[in-house]
C-alpha cells in the first residue's frame, strides 16, 4: 500500500429529514470515528469531515406537510443529529451543511467547469406537471398504482410495498400529491451527466483496487459497469436546492439534482474547515496533493455514488487540467446493514432505535463498544437489547471495569496511591501478552478496516490483565510477601495504562478516565504527536516506581439490570406487532379493506390461468423478473416484482393467475402485458397464487 502523508476521511451525509438511528451509526459514523481516532493515536495527519445533506424532494414534502419552510426542517434535524453525534463521541473536525453559501458556490463551480468543457448533455423530456399548482412534479410528488404489485399508494420513485424502483410515468392512475389532481405531461429540458463517457476510466479506476477494496464494494460497482453506464440527470424542476448557475431562460426554476450536489459536500466542507483554521487554501493539501489519501465511509446503499458517480464528477473536473487536480478515493469501506432485533431498521415504518433517544437512557461508551463488536463488515449483523446488556455487564463492567477499579483501589489503600515497584521489560513480557504481535494485530485490523477484530484484540489485553491479577491474588500475598504484591500491582497499573491507549479508539471517554485515575495531567489527546505512534509504547511499561496516582477511583461501567431492559423489550414487541399488522394489510385495531366496487366493475377484470415458460432477471432492476407466459394458444410477456422471492428457475413451470386485460405498460424499457397475482406474507415475503387442476391453462377465473 502506498505511503501517504495525510488522510482525509469523509462520512456519508445523513439526510436532514429525520433523526439518525443505530443502523446509521453502525454502518458509517462509528467505524469512521474508530479509524480517525486510531490515526490520531498513531501520530498521523488526518481530518474527519461530515455534514448534513439538506436538499431534495423529501425535505420539501415534509415542510409542506408541517406547514413550515424547508429551512425550518433542515435546521431542526441538522442540530438534532449533530448533537447526537457529539454525545456519542463522533469526533468530526468539521460538520457542515449543504445549504451553506460556500457549498452552493462549490457545487456551482463544478457545474460551470464541466459545462464549459461541453461534457453535459441537454435533453428535452416529458414530465408530469400539476396545472393547478403551476409546477413540474418530481418523482416523490406523484403517487399512483404500482404496475408490479397493484399497490395503490406507490410513489413515483419506488413502491414501498414490493420495493420496485419506478418512474412516475410507469404508475397507473397517477395523482399529484400537491392537489390530488391527475397531472398532465409537459416537455421540460434538463442537463444530463454522461456517465458512459467515463466508463473505461472508471473500469480502470475500480480495477486498480481489486486487492484492497471490499468484495461487496467491487461487486456492487461491477454490476453497474457490466450493465453499461447511462446518462444521469443532474438538474430538477424544484425551488429548494442549488440554482443552476446559468444566465439562460431554460435554466430558470431548475436546481442541481441532490446526487450531484451532496457528494461535493466533502469538498466544500473541507474548504469551510480550512477557513476556520485560518488557512483558506489548506484543504487543497488533502484533496489535491498526490501524497494525500481520501477514504469515504458509507453504507452499502451508497456504494455506486462513491465508486462511480463522485469519481466521474472529479474525472470531468480534472479533464484537460494541469493544476487543481482532485484525488480519487483510495478506499470506500462500505459496510453491510445492522438490523434491529432481526429486522431491517426503517424510519418510514418507525422500526428503529434513534441515537438521541438511546443516549437519553444509556451511556455512549457502552453503545460504541457493543456496535463495534457487532460491526457489519462483510455481512449484515444484528443489534439486540440482550446482547447489548450482556456485553456491557460481562465484558465492560466485569472484565475491564473490575480490573481497573481493583488495581487502583488496592494501590490507593495499601501502597499510598504510589506505583510501588519498578517493572522490568522481562516481567512485562511474561504477562501472557505478546506485545509485538498485539500491536501488529491492532495496526493490521485498523488499517484494513476490520474494526471488530481491532476492538477484540484490545479487549484481549483486558482479559489477560484480569487473569493475571486474579491469579496473583495480591490481597492475600501482601500478608507474607509485600514486595511480591508490590510487583503485581506495579504490573497491573501499567496494564491499566496500556488499556487506556489500546482501547482509546472505541472507548475514548473511558480511556481518559483511566488516564486521570492513573495520575496524569491533561488528556490522552494531549499526548498525540505527529510521527509518534502511541501503540508502539505498549511494548514497555510506562509507569515508573514512585509515580503517584490521582488518589481517586470510580466505577467505569454501571451494570444494566433486567428492569432497565424490560421496557425496551416490550417496545420491541409493540413495534413488531405494528410492523406485522402493516405487512398483513391491517392496522393494530382492525383489518382495513379497499372501497367497495360494483359487481359490473369486477366483471371487467379478466383473470386467466397461465403457465410460466421462461424467466430471466431484468437489467438494473433487482426486484424484477421478465416472464414469458403461455396463456391458452397465445404467449404474453409480463414483468413481475418477485425477483427477491423467486429465482428464474423456480418460476419456470409454475401455474399462475394473470390479469389478462390490463393495458400494456413499459417498465425499464420492457413491455409488460398484464399483472400476476401474489399474496404478501410474513416479513414481506411474496407467494404466487398458483391455481391447481388439469387442462386449466388459459381458463378464466369463475
Swiss-Prot record:
Note on how the cofactor is bound: Binds 1 zinc ion per subunit.
Co-factor(s): Zn(2+)
**Motif range ('HIGH' region):** 14-24
The answer to whether keyword Membrane applies is no
Q: Where in the cell is it found?
A: Cytoplasm
Instruction: Please give the SUPFAM superfamilies that the UniProt record associates with this protein.
Output: Anticodon-binding domain of a subclass of class I aminoacyl-tRNA synthetases, Methionyl-tRNA synthetase (MetRS), Zn-domain, Nucleic acid-binding proteins, Nucleotidylyl transferase
What highest taxon heads this organism's lineage? Bacteria
What's the EC number here? 6.1.1.10
**Ribosomal protein as UniProt keyword:** no
Residues annotated as domain tRNA-binding: 601-702
Q: Name one GO biological process term.
A: methionyl-tRNA aminoacylation
InterPro entries with a match to the protein in the record: aa-tRNA-synth_I_CS, Anticodon_Met, Met-tRNA-synth_bsu_C, Met-tRNA_ligase_1, Met-tRNA_synth, Methionyl/Leucyl_tRNA_Synth, MetRS_core, MetRS_Zn
What GO molecular function annotations does the UniProt record carry, in alphabetical order?
Answer: ATP binding; metal ion binding; methionine-tRNA ligase activity; tRNA binding
Pfam families recorded for this chain? Anticodon_3 (PF19303), tRNA-synt_1g (PF09334), tRNA_bind (PF01588)
Q: What class of enzyme is it?
A: ligase
Main location (coarse class): cytoplasm
> Which residues of the sequence carry a binding annotation for ATP?
347
Catalysed reactions, semicolon-separated = tRNA(Met) + L-methionine + ATP = L-methionyl-tRNA(Met) + AMP + diphosphate
Disulfide connectivity?
Answer: none
Query: Can you tell me which family this protein belongs to?
Result: Belongs to the class-I aminoacyl-tRNA synthetase family. MetG type 1 subfamily.
**Subunit notes for this chain?**
Homodimer.
Please describe what this protein does. Is required not only for elongation of protein synthesis but also for the initiation of all mRNA translation through initiator tRNA(fMet) aminoacylation.
Q: What is this protein called?
A: Methionine--tRNA ligase
Source organism (scientific name): Chlorobium phaeovibrioides (strain DSM 265 / 1930)
